[in-house]
């Protein structure tokens, strides 16, 4: 494989670092470690990819980004669900609460910083939240109607003013 991108950018010298797997059963310790590592990567201006099992890993990733930057950032959330619950199954750091925790961050100015794509289901708590807050969303049905090109243009237009954007994909966006 040649060391270039499809835009003929030279990748020679590009380094990939695997920070390892996280196995700690203590969610608090796990979150602190992920947050610290992400913050360090962002401070070093490194591009990173986080691959995790449970979507709750988004919470410490966003906290790490937030602690490392000094400007507002956007979030593109591609998922079958909003993940906007204040609490789910007794936990505020559940996979269903990731974006609710995001809007509590210093550099996320409420739900308007988030663009939800592919949503096909919502919890009652999320519907109540949406009644009182502006939420950018293209549902799965609307995506089908608009088509990929129009969705991409809509999202680009809405998110263009952000210097930094975090993209998160939950596996159920594929079905």
Question: What residues fall within each predicted segment?
Answer:
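Conserved alpha-helical scaffold segments that buttress catalytic/binding sites
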Residues: 1-175
